[in-house]
Structures are given as C-alpha cells and as structure tokens.
Amino acid sequence: MTVRQRLLSYFFNRLRMNYPQILSPVLNFLHCPTPQAWIVQARDPQNLPLLLTDHLICELKAAQTALLLVRKYVADKSGADALLSWLQPYEAFAFRQGPEPDFVALHKQISKSAMPQTDDPWGRQLIDRMVLLIKEELHHFWQVREVMQARNIPYVKITASRYAKGMLKAVRTHEPLTLIDKLICGAYIEARSCERFAALAPWLDEDLQTFYLSLLRSEARHYQDYLALAQQISAEDISARVRYFGEVEADLILSPDREFRFHSGVPAAG
C-alpha cells in the first residue's frame, strides 16, 4: 500500500467513525429519510454521470443563493461586485458553454479577495457565514469536476430539478418574512444534501465514498448557519415556519418524480 493509499484509508476510517454524530442532528431536522427507491436508482453506475453533473450544478447554485442573499440584504456595491466576479467564470462554464477555467487558480484568487463590509451586526454575521459557504461550495464544485474528469465524464448541460423551485413557491412575499423563509429553505436544502451524501456513500467505490463523506461536516454546518440566521433576524420564534417547510420538503422527496436528479423525489414508473 502506498503512502497516499494509507492516508486515504486513515482519513476514510476517521470519517466513518465521526459521520454518525455529524449526521444525527440532520436526520432529526429533516422530516423523512431519502426513499430507498431513489438510492437504488442513484447507485446504478449508468446514472453516475447524471448524478455527478447535477451535483456539480447544485454546488454552484448553493453559492449563487448565498451570494444573492449577501447582495440583496447587506453588501455595499463594491463588495457585491467582488462577489459577482467570483462566480462569473463558473457560471460562464456551467450555463453559457464558456471555456473551462483553471478552477484551482480561481479558488486561490477568491481566498485573497476583499470581503463586503457592513456596520450591522446581523449583516456582519450573514456576510461571514455566506462568504465562507460560497468559498466552500465553489471548492466542492471543482472537486466534483475533478472527479468527473478522472472518470472521463464530460460536462453536459441538464435541466434543473423541481426541488428548489418547489421549496421557494412557499416563500412569503413581504419582508422580512421573505428573508426568513429563504434562510429556512436554505437550511433544508443543505440538510438534504448532507443526508443524501451519507445515504449514497456506502454504495459507491472507495474514492467516491471518501469524497462524499468528506462533505458532510460542511453541509451540516451550512444548514445550522442558515437556521441561526433566520432565528436571529426574526422578531418571533420560527419553529412553526421551520416545521411547515419541513413538510413541504418531505412532500417533494416522497412524491413521484419523473426526472432523476440529486434532490429528486421517488422515481416515477414509466
């Protein structure tokens, strides 16, 4: 066994020991587990290119969501423009058939960028947590892209799932309730991603297992960050609203879905 293989084995074993305690709050938060029928479809090797492609796009969309929250609610113009510049090369590649950039170089550039500024304490928390989330999601984006390249899986544009749109349909339309609801939706999307990584990992080869389990800690923290921000900005307890979106999310996961995606529902027959 090479040094690299020993390190991977050690890392993987540590992850396997730690991930149940990371996952437990996520499972308690979600209203249902991933249906077995989805896992059966997801573990089919023929579906791996589609699964990885949708996972890639989900990472970018998670970064976009965080960016939009910062831009709309707290960022000064220069800070907002800086954040926009972070995502533009990724968006051009993923959505507009632009050239594939050097994602490693882009990530290093992002790490050195100036942060948006605000004097509002809650706004400062939003910036700090969302900027970290953006960096992590973009890092995951190019990690998934590396996995695809290593397996000779080309990037092909695909349609979006119904999942996020289904969640956002339930968002109230006046502030600050809109913001609160969007933050709660963000929490559920991150929590479901975490749960699906864990549900799928045992059925994948060791490299993909290690990769997916390595994402659990950050995804679990992201859902908690979203929830904390929602409660902090709300003048009232948000528990009822959290339960409501839990029911919306569970219905999307448990109902038949004709399109297989990373966050799709029960595979529909026919």
Swiss-Prot record:
Contains a nonheme dinuclear iron cluster. Contains three different forms of the dinuclear site: an hydroxo-bridged FeIII-OH-FeIII center, an oxo-bridged FeIII-O-FeIII center and an hydroxo-bridged FeII-OH-FeIII mixed-valent center. Pfam families: MiaE. One of its GO terms (biological process) is tRNA modification. SUPFAM superfamilies: Ferritin-like. GO terms for molecular function: metal ion binding; monooxygenase activity; tRNA 2-(methylsulfanyl)-N(6)-isopentenyladenosine(37) hydroxylase activity. Pathway: tRNA modification; 2-methylthio-N-6-(cis-hydroxy)isopentenyl adenosine-tRNA biosynthesis. It is an enzyme of class 1 (oxidoreductase). Its cofactor is Fe cation. Fe cation 2 binds at E137, E190, E219, H222. Binding of tRNA to MiaE induces a protein conformational change that influences the electronic structure of the diiron site. Belongs to the MiaE family. NCBIfam families: tRNAmsioHdxaseMiaE. This is tRNA 2-(methylsulfanyl)-N(6)-isopentenyladenosine(37) hydroxylase. It comes from Salmonella typhimurium (strain LT2 / SGSC1412 / ATCC 700720). The gene is miaE.
